[in-house]
Structures are given as structure tokens and as C-alpha cells.
From Swiss-Prot:
Coiled coil: none annotated. Belongs to the FMP52 family. This is Protein FMP52, mitochondrial. PANTHER family: OXIDOREDUCTASE HTATIP2 (PTHR14097:SF7). One of its GO terms (cellular component) is mitochondrial outer membrane. InterPro entries: NAD(P)-bd_dom, NAD(P)-bd_dom_sf. It is found in: Mitochondrion outer membrane. It is a peripheral membrane protein. The keyword Mitochondrion applies. Keywords: Membrane, Mitochondrion, Mitochondrion outer membrane, Transit peptide. It comes from the Eukaryota.
Length: 238
């Protein structure tokens, strides 16, 4: 296949896994990543970057939309696993600027460039009416992405993400991850809906592939919590 894929957030826990599984896909001949720093792709077979991957390093994220507009061939599928936390951003305003602003403008640029499928990694409990900043921002972003009207928009709403991170996401998130590991597979799992980042990355790539093949009846799909964990055994991209 001659389809190209754009991945945002490739230096993160989930994004690195998206890159890993995209490399095994037969549906993408070209994989673009746009990032502030050159990523160390997670668990790749070798330390050499795949020739199918083109990494655009741009330290000024406000220039990412223009960089996306200039991609050749234009990506037909777009996956965003990009995001941060208030603790890492430093303030509520900066958090929204990163988590909502960069995500929205990049998705808009991908849509205008011709992308047919958008897969957004959001969060379990995302709700634009939530009193909590994180959930509210995620919900607002979901609504804004849906309003862009990609032919297919798939929103993944995972619970606690399990896996080895390169940096802390703040005390609250670190605590949730530790508890999520303990409760995975137990009766307490529905509280946090834990999922391995590798499984979520695999699922994101699978949805992008299926979207390009027109396998969905609905234009907008939301897959949340336990629905994602149920897909782990169904989606096999290995």
C-alpha cells in the first residue's frame, strides 16, 4: 500500500508504541513524526531508524501545523498520542495551550492536507463539562476534533496507562500507575481501567488501518475503558 501515516507524540509512552506497530504494518509505506526532539523509538528491533520513518524535528510547536502542511506525500491517516499533564506543563494555561491548542491545530492541518482518518488518544472520563481541568480539556479537544469532520474519527479513551516512562507525569499520575498495575486483572480494575501502552499503541494503528479501508459504518467512534481492554485479544498486529 502507498498510504502514509502521521504520528504526533512519538516521544511519549503511547506514541513510541504507535511508531513501533506502525513499522510492522503493511498498510503504510511512509510514516511521519513531528516532534520537539528526535525520538528514541520504543522497543524497536534495532537502534537504526526505519527508512520508512521521516522524523521532522521542530522545537517550536507553533510551527508544527505548517510542517504538517508541507509533508509529501500528504498523510492519509493521523494518530495523535500527544499530551501532557498540568504538573509537567507548569500551569493550567500552559496545559491547555499544549494539550488542546497544539493537538487541535495539528489535527486541523492534517485534515486540510487530506487525511481521511484521525485516531485521537484521549482519556477515560473525558468530558467538556467536567469540573476537573484535565478531563474538561480532553473533552473539549474531543469535541473540536469531531467538528473537523474527518471522514473517520476514532477517539480512544484509555484508563491508567501502564509501561515504562522516561519521565514522571506528576505525583497523582505516578500513584495511579502503581495502583493500576496492582489492580490489573482484579475486581478493582474497573476503577482505573488500566491498559498497557503497547496494547493501546497496537489498537491505535489497527483503527487507522481499518479506517482507511472504510470498514466502519459510523463516522465517529469512541472506544472507552473496558471496551479497549476487550480489544486487546481481538486486534493482532504482530
Amino acid at each position: 500500500m502507498s498510504n502514509s501515516l502521521l504520528i504526533l507524540g512519538s516521544t511519549g509512552l503511547v506514541g513510541g508504541q504507535v511508531v513501533k506497530f506502525a513499522q510492522t504494518s503493511k498498510d503504510f509505506s511512509k510514516i511521519f513524526t513531528v516532534t520537539r526532539r528526535k525520538p528514541e523509538f520504543a522497543n524497536t528491533a534495532s537502534t537504526t531508524e526505519s527508512p520508512r520513518i521521516d522524523t521532522i524535528v521542530e522545537t517550536d510547536s507553533s510551527k508544527w501545523p505548517q510542517a504538517i502542511s508541507n509533508l509529501e506525500p500528504a498523510p492519509l491517516a493521523y494518530i495523535s498520542a500527544f499530551g501532557t499533564t498540568r504538573a509537567n506543563a507548569g500551569s493550567a494555561e500552559k496545559f491547555k495551550e499544549i494539550d488542546y491548542g497544539i493537538n487541535y491545530e495539528s489535527a486541523k492541518a492534517a485534515k486540510e492536507a487530506g487525511a481521511k482518518v484521525c485516531v485521537l488518544v484521549s482519556s477515560y472520563g473525558a468530558n467538556a463539562k467536567s469540573p476537573f481541568l484535565y478531563m474538561k480539556t480532553k473533552g473539549e479537544l474531543e469535541n473540536a476534533i469531531i467538528d473537523l469532520k474527518f471522514p473517520y474519527t476514532i477517539i480512544l479513551q484509555p484508563g491508567v496507562l501502564l509501561g515504562e516512562r522516561n519521565e514522571s507525569k506528576g505525583f497523582g499520575n505516578d500513584w495511579a500507575v502503581k495502583f493500576g498495575k496492582l489492580c490489573k486483572g482484579t475486581w478493582f480494575a474497573p476503577l482505573l481501567q488500566p491498559i498497557e501502552a503497547s496494547d493501546l499503541g497496537r489498537i491505535a494503528v489497527e483503527f487507522a488501518e481499518r479506517g482507511l479501508k472504510g470498514e466502519f459504518r459510523e463516522n465517529v467512534l469512541k472506544v472507552s475503558g473496558s471496551e479497549l481492554t476487550e480489544l486487546v485479544d481481538d486486534f493482532k498486529i504482530v
